[in-house]
UniProtKB/Swiss-Prot annotation:
GO MF term (any one): L-amino-acid oxidase activity
Designated name of the protein: L-amino-acid oxidase
Gene3D superfamilies: 3.90.660.10, FAD/NAD(P)-binding domain (3.50.50.60), Guanine Nucleotide Dissociation Inhibitor, domain 1 (1.10.405.10)
Binding site for FAD: 70-71, 90-91, 98, 114-117, 288, 485, 492-497
Organism: Siganus canaliculatus
Enzyme class: oxidoreductase
Assembly mode: Homodimer.
Cofactors: FAD
Glycosylation sites: N58, N393
Function recorded in the entry: Inhibits the growth of both Gram-negative and Gram-positive bacteria. Displays strong antibacterial activity towards V.cholerae and E.tarda. Causes deformation of the surface of S.aureus and the formation of pores on the surface of E.coli. Strong antiparasitic activity is seen towards C.irritans, T.brucei and I.multifiliis. Cilia of treated theronts are lost and the macronucleus swells, inducing cell membrane rupture and efflux of the cytoplasm.
EC number(s) recorded for this UniProt protein: 1.4.3.2
Disulphide-bonded residues: C37-C200
Binding site for substrate: R117, Y403, A492, W493
Length: 527
């Protein structure tokens, strides 16, 4: 589950998308110009807000936050500290949302089923982690001793890095000798040229209509084999139909040139750390079914798991931090605007599946592997080796034996856990040998498309959705505000959820101060 963006006023219709995806700043090179387009111009301001806190209010103001994920917890902390009375309502039996860690306390190991890594430039997340006492350790993204198993060929990563042609993709002569990432970066030259010549907004207006595949094939002119190479080796094959901008974000944040950390002991320790600084009610097992607005406030009606009747909570404002799809299961009275409902319905959510296999030993260490990933064009796709061990169990091996997205993930939805275990083992045997089969002791599977609280893994825009829906997803409607990773960029990251929460909390606080008569002019939504 990073972008850096400036406040965009609701009146700035022309900025509809500059929203964050492309919001420009001059830089010293073409590459830096494109990088600048991917950053929030208000990032420093957001970081300053969490460090300094929001201006304190003078009157009692009750805010109900729907959802106890990272966005909800972040907003709760800011609003609580500013003097608001906060209540969090969460449908699940736990906090954290898509930060979920499976823990086998009996055997002394854990596995992150959702968010698992933090890029080095996610300063807002890292500030909270430090403040909350959450420890981080390096997440090893790349290990040269891992493997590629594609086109029926098994090769060590270091041999592929030395000679990409060894994988036998039938690329054109002009494409030979280039890695998948080099091919992709070269293909972006027309986007970079557009940014340098006309700015970020012009580039967005011109290229938001393209899917990744359409751009790479029709504009950049890559061969079909180069496309297949990029899809296989950058884990983008199943994402070729999504917006070009999403692929640019993805490769900017998930690549071997970015440094990462992970939460020591499991990512769920991060949301759990908020409990030590929050003094607000958190109502678990409480599913919001209706949000009713009036001139005097809002009424949030939720159903507790053990009760048939609804319970009403009266508040001054509500902040909805669920996924866009989960929000569709709530009744809003009066109805949300047509544009808001269209955005919630239409925004594309990706699928993601993780298959965790446990072993009686860490067999990959015999191959000289610590951390990193092996890549295959078989159903497992990406295999991640752990960057940590377990103090309570020095022998157990816990492997993310398959990490898939989009259509690669959808392929796995109908299979049982046991079937997925056998599928992942078959692929591992082809890479590490038959010996691993006898070492396997168990399986844990997480299919985010089947999660009854998120209804998907994370937002991932298709062509035109940046221009059509990005601003609308964040926009408040009266006393009802919205936040979550789907309302910020880049999608899927914990910090993006936090950035949206800071913006929403700031807007709620400004609206409260306005009602106190401290400001003369209405404060529009800031994104």
């Amino acid at each position: 589950m990073d972008l850096h963006r400036a406040p965009w006023k609701s009146s700035a219709a022309a900025a509809v998308l500059l929203l964050a995806l492309f919001s420009g700043a001059a830089a010293s090179s073409v590459e830096k110009n494109l990088a600048a387009c991917l950053r929030d111009n208000d990032y420093d301001q957001l970081l300053q807000t969490v460090q300094d806190g929001l201006p304190h209010i003078n009157t009692s103001n009750h805010v109900v936050i729907v959802g106890a994920g990272v966005a909800g917890l972040t907003a709760a902390k800011l609003l609580q500290d500013a003097g608001h009375r906060v209540t969090i309502v969460e449908a699940n039996s736990r906090i954290g949302g898509r930060v979920e860690t499976y823990r086998n306390k009996e055997e002394g190991w854990y596995a992150d089923l959702g968010a698992m890594r933090i890029p080095s430039d996610h300063s807002i997340f890292r500030w909270f982690a430090k403040t909350l006492g959450v420890k981080l350790n390096p997440f090893i993204m790349d290990d040269h001793n891992t493997f590629y198993f594609v086109n029926g060929l098994l090769k060590r990563t270091y041999t592929v890095e030395a000679n990409p042609d060894i994988l036998n993709y039938k690329v054109r002569s002009s494409e030979k000798g280039k890695s998948a990432n080099t091919l992709f970066q070269d293909a972006l030259q027309k986007v970079k040229d557009e940014v340098e010549a006309h700015g970020c907004r012009a580039a967005l207006m011109k290229y938001d209509k393209y899917s990744a595949k359409e751009y790479l094939k029709e504009v950049a002119g890559l061969s079909s084999e180069a496309l297949r190479m990029i899809g296989d080796l950058l884990n983008e094959q199943s994402l070729m139909y999504t917006a070009l901008s999403e692929m640019i974000y993805d490769q900017a944040d998930v690549n071997d040139n970015v440094q990462y950390d992970e939460v020591t002991g499991g990512t769920d320790l991060f949301p759990r750390a908020f409990l030590s600084v929050l003094d607000v009610p958190i109502l678990l097992n409480s599913k919001v079914q209706r949000i009713r607005r009036s001139r005097d406030g809002v009424t949030v009606s939720f159903k507790e798991s053990q009760r048939s009747s609804l319970t009403d909570l009266h508040a001054d404002m509500v902040l909805v931090t669920t996924t866009a799809k989960a929000a569709l299961y709530m009744d809003f009275e009066p109805s949300l605007s047509i544009r808001k409902m269209e955005a919630l319905r239409a925004v594309h959510y990706d699928s993601s599946t993780k298959i965790i296999l446990t072993f009686s030993s860490r067999f990959w260490e015999e191959d000289g592997i610590r951390g990193g990933k092996s890549i295959t064009d078989r159903p497992s796709r990406y295999i991640y080796y752990p960057s940590h061990t377990f103090p309570a169990n020095s022998s157990v091996g816990v492997l993310l034996a398959s990490y898939t997205w989009s259509d690669d993930s959808l392929l796995l939805q109908a299979a049982s856990d046991e079937e997925l275990k056998e599928m992942a083992l078959r692929d591992l045997v082809k890479i590490h040998g038959e010996r691993v089969r006898a070492l396997c002791t168990g399986v844990v599977v997480k299919k985010w498309s089947l999660d009854p609280y998120s209804f998907g893994a994370f937002a991932l825009f298709t062509p035109y959705q940046h221009l059509e829906y990005a601003k609308e997803l964040f926009r408040s409607e009266g006393r009802v505000h919205f936040a979550g990773e789907h309302t910020a960029f880049p999608h899927a990251w914990m910090e993006s959820a936090m950035k949206s929460a800071i913006r929403a909390a700031t807007n709620i606080n400004k609206q409260t101060l306005l009602n106190e008569g401290m400001n003369e002019c209405p404060a529009p939504d800031e994104l």
